A protein has these predicted regions:
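Conserved catalytic cysteine-centered active-site region
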Residues: 117-119, 238-245, 270-281, 285-288
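Phosphate/diphosphate-binding loops
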Residues: 126, 132-134, 274-320, 543-570, ...
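Glycine-rich loop/linker segments at domain edges
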Residues: 35, 40-47, 173-205, 294-378, ...
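Thiamine diphosphate
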Residues: 250-273, 277-279, 500-507
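Flexible, low-hydrophobicity surface segments
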Residues: 18-170, 271, 626
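C-terminal catalytic domains of large/alpha subunits in multi-subunit enzymes
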Residues: 96-97, 236-243, 271-276, 305, ...
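Conserved beta-alpha junction segments in alpha/beta enzyme cores
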Residues: 182-235, 332-335, 457-486, 491, ...
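Local cysteine-cluster metal-coordination motifs and their immediate loop/turn environment
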Residues: 2-9
């Protein structure tokens, strides 16, 4: 437990006091675009005083808990809540019959039951929820709910699901002459395991009834407006009766995009008339959020004798698990980027997002682009080896450039795409010369013999869209006002650790001309949506709204007072003070703006169209040491060059790069959810292996800046590219060290040693 210095109390519409930590999320940012100011939430996080959703309490608060299915697929015969209600301190036990509104929810398609009523479709599916006076009692009561099941045979093989037409979406992309052929052909089958986002903070929230039939919801989220819409529908209330508030979040990476405990909390709070809090434990968290889709892929690449690609065929099957979540969009992304950042005129891609009784899968950093990168980059290495061409030169000869069509959709790439610059930058970076016992596979324990260790070097280049696609109306609203001698940015954009609280303040400071700015997160009743903190979009979209609002505000103030500059002192004219800042702050100057990215379209029947608003890419070089006798791998260093548009905050970008690379390393050599018959066998951080700081390689990062993006000051989103090709680079390096044709990630010791 972190030491709490005291309590901050606020009274909501219900009249109840919500108690949080004394030191609330942040403070003022000094420094403008291009600087790397200290994060306003950095010290509180470092000292353990940051306010997370788990820290919220309220007067008269109850605790919630969930009864979950022990079967991946079963018919519900009966539910008896009486045993739970006999436990002292239990205030409510709710089932599907108690859902007052729409019985299902879903981020893109409402198909998931709020509480299962007739059938359970995955292991851990919620069947009932309980409210009690303390957490232990709530969990005991949830375990006491007597549910009679009739187990059924689960469908767990995505390829079988595909043949049965159990799919959420199919994709078909055809571009160019389908009879085109090359001089050389390589084929391959590839598989990617199920990865967890593994945020350190589990799902948590607090719902407080307002006494008038409505509720205030404080819960972990990446998209509070869409969460609110789903809660409203299932509660059968008006939109203004549910207010979703941003909270402190201990990591997300896609795990917070889908609703989980949100509706349950509100149902319990409204039923009991008391605030209700829920916090998932780690095992529950593995069933309470979606995961990265496992994928199976077949590729066929054809090229001429000079290494120029002539045709690419691919078949991509991803397992969506029991419910839709974002499977349709992830599949589309995987297919749109199935060729990578390479020029080719003949393409055929087919894809399926299957429905099984495996755990639901959805958004995770990279959103489909990670999986296909494993396939197409292995294919590029195979072609290079067959033709005797250097792997980087093979990629350079086929690199996309601005003005080229995307090889799958035919969309013309209008914004900067420095693929060749990235490749050349990687080639120019010096290789490490490291011979340190501590870096050997097995570490300083000397479980390996240096004589057996082989060094390998591998390369990979990845590409992905920025923002939402396929005609989605992607927008964000922001409000900028003058207050307390500086700028205040109000937004519903969620800070999940990526540094948005710093960047939005930097944008406002630069646009207004003041030296201090604060970001204030507000609830759904106070501002329109900022969209999801996903798709590497917030810097561009919410940043664009902030820039537009701040620019308008500055222009209005200067026009009103006929000034020629705005500074910390106030409105200036001919270098003299015209109106003091203190006076401006009391006059309520503010401006609200809504920013949209360039319009996109859905694909036609051949998969063609202007599907994306922008693109970003990165390249990685991995250096590994491998002991092929023990199957141990040490990732020594990762070099990377990344397309960032304009670097608004270089240190923050480097932080994103290092974190994203470590997730990529995890997928390459250790991270995988093991599901047997639909049951997760490793739902904890003891058995689900994660890279620690001891596994973190040295990282050398080069930020490639180019003008031309429509983001604020030319910025691009930077969160996802570090993850897309880092996995593939590590696997390529292991192939180089061992000579093995590794086609599955994560690469396990038995894949190397046996």
């Amino acid at each position: 437990m972190h030491r709490v210095r005291g309590d901050h109390q606020s009274t909501g519409r219900s009249g109840r006091t919500v108690t949080t930590r004394t030191v609330k999320r942040p403070a003022t940012v000094e420094g403008g675009v291009g600087d790397s100011p200290t994060r306003p939430d950095g010290v509180t996080k470092l000292c353990g005083r940051f306010e997370y959703a788990q820290d919220l309490t309220a007067e008269g608060m109850l605790w919630g808990a969930t009864t979950r299915s022990p079967h991946p697929h079963a018919r519900i015969i009966s539910i008896d809540v009486a045993p739970a209600l006999t436990i002292g301190g239990v205030h409510a036990v709710l089932t599907a019959d108690d859902v007052p509104g729409r019985a299902v929810f879903g981020l893109e398609h409402a198909d998931q039951p709020v509480l299962a009523s007739e059938v359970v479709n995955y292991w851990g599916e919620p069947v009932a929820v309980v409210a009690a006076e303390d957490e232990d009692t709530a969990r005991r009561a949830a375990a006491a709910v007597a549910v009679e099941y009739e187990p059924m045979e689960p469908l767990v093989d995505p390829l079988e699901a595909d043949t049965r037409d159990e799919v959420f979406r199919r994709m078909r992309i055809r571009r160019g002459d389908q009879n085109a052929r090359g001089d050389v052909v390589v084929e391959g089958y590839y598989e990617v395991g199920m990865q967890d986002q593994a945020p350190l903070g589990t799902e948590a929230g607090l719902a407080v009834p307002d006494g008038h039939g409505g509720v205030d919801l404080y819960a972990t989220s990446q998209f509070i407006h869409v969460d609110q819409e789903q809660v409203v529908a299932s509660l059968g209330l008006r939109s203004d009766q549910v207010r979703a508030h941003p909270t402190g979040i201990g990591g997300a990476f896609g795990a917070r995009e889908d609703v989980n405990l949100h509706i349950h909390l509100c149902m319990l709070a409204l039923h009991t008339g008391q605030p209700v809090k829920m916090v998932y434990d780690r095992s529950e968290s593995f069933t309470g959020h979606v995961h990265r889709h496992p994928a199976r892929m077949w590729y066929r690449h054809e090229a001429d004798h000079h290494g120029k690609l002539k045709r690419v065929e691919a078949r991509v099957v991803i397992d969506g698990g029991a419910y839709a979540s974002t499977t349709a969009a992830v599949l589309a992304n995987a297919c749109y980027f199935a060729v990578g950042p390479y020029r080719v005129d003949s393409v055929a891609v087919d894809g399926a997002g299957t429905r099984t009784n495996n755990p639901p899968c959805g958004a995770m950093r990279g959103f489909g682009a990670v999986q296909v990168c494993v396939g197409y980059e292995a294919q590029m290495d195979k072609l290079a080896a067959m033709l005797g061409i250097d792997p980087l030169e093979m990629r350079r000869r086929n690199a996309l450039e601005t003005g080229d069509p995307l090889p799958t959709t035919g969309q013309i790439i209008e914004t900067p795409l420095p693929v060749i610059d990235v490749i050349d930058s990687l080639a120019a970076m010096p290789l490490p010369d490291i011979d340190d016992r501590a870096t050997l596979p097995g570490g300083s324990g000397l479980t390996t013999d240096r004589a057996h260790v082989r060094r390998g070097v591998g390369y990979a280049i990845g590409i992905k869209n920025l923002g939402f696609s396929e005609g989605f109306d992607d927008f964000a609203q922001a409000r900028v006002r003058l207050e307390d001698g500086g700028a205040v940015v109000e937004t519903a954009a969620i800070e999940v650790g990526q540094g948005l609280v710093t960047v939005l303040a930097q944008i406002a400071r630069t646009a207004l001309g003041v030296s201090k700015a604060t970001v204030r997160h507000v609830d759904t009743s106070q501002i329109d949506s900022a969209g999801s903190t996903s798709a590497s979009r917030q810097t561009q979209i919410s940043g664009g709204a902030t820039l537009e609002a701040a620019t308008r505000l500055r222009e209005r103030i200067l026009e009103h007072y006929e000034g020629d500059d705005l500074t910390d002192d106030g409105v200036m004219r001919d270098r003299g003070l015209l109106v003091p800042m203190a006076a401006l702050a009391t006059e309520g100057w503010e401006e609200t703006a809504t920013f949209r990215h360039p319009p996109t379209t859905g694909p036609d029947e051949e998969g063609q169209g202007t599907v994306h608003a922008d693109f970003a890419m990165a390249g990685h070089r991995a250096v590994v040491d491998v002991d092929p006798e023990l199957g141990l791998v040490s990732v020594v260093r990762i070099d990377t060059a990344q397309d960032v548009g304009r670097a608004l905050n270089p240190d923050s970008i480097r932080g994103q790069i290092e974190g994203g690379i470590l997730q990529g390393v995890g997928l390459a050599v250790m991270e995988e959810i093991i599901s047997e018959g639909g049951v997760i066998k490793n739902p904890n951080f003891t058995d689900y292996l994660l890279p620690t700081i001891l596994d973190a390689p040295d990282v050398e990062a080069l930020l490639i800046e180019q003008d031309g993006s429509w983001g604020p000051f030319g910025a691009k989103g930077v969160g996802e590219p570090p993850t897309i090709s880092s996995t593939s680079a590590v696997v390529a390096a292991i192939r180089d060290a061992t000579g093995r044709d590794l086609s599955r990630v994560p690469v396990r010791p038995q894949d190397i040693a046996l």
